[in-house]
């Protein structure tokens, strides 16, 4: 019984790190269209929905790029360059 519980916990933790829209078309179809994006749009963390791209000075990056992506012509400059998953700030290339 304990082995089954552990197995289910492992499966659930793997599932929680995945993007559900990869296999669920209705989630992709339910994406909201972003409005008033100053720098255009980019895809969200899962690559499913369009979101507003970050502009110069905004926070970006983080684990799996959870903080968002910078607009074209900007780069996410990490505050802590030693930490791969650290957040950054969008700056001109």
Curated annotation (Swiss-Prot):
SUPFAM superfamilies: Growth factor receptor domain. The keyword Secreted applies. Keywords: Disulfide bond, Secreted, Signal. GO terms for molecular function: insulin-like growth factor binding. This is Venom protein 302. GO terms for biological process: regulation of cell growth; regulation of signal transduction. Pfam families: IGFBP.
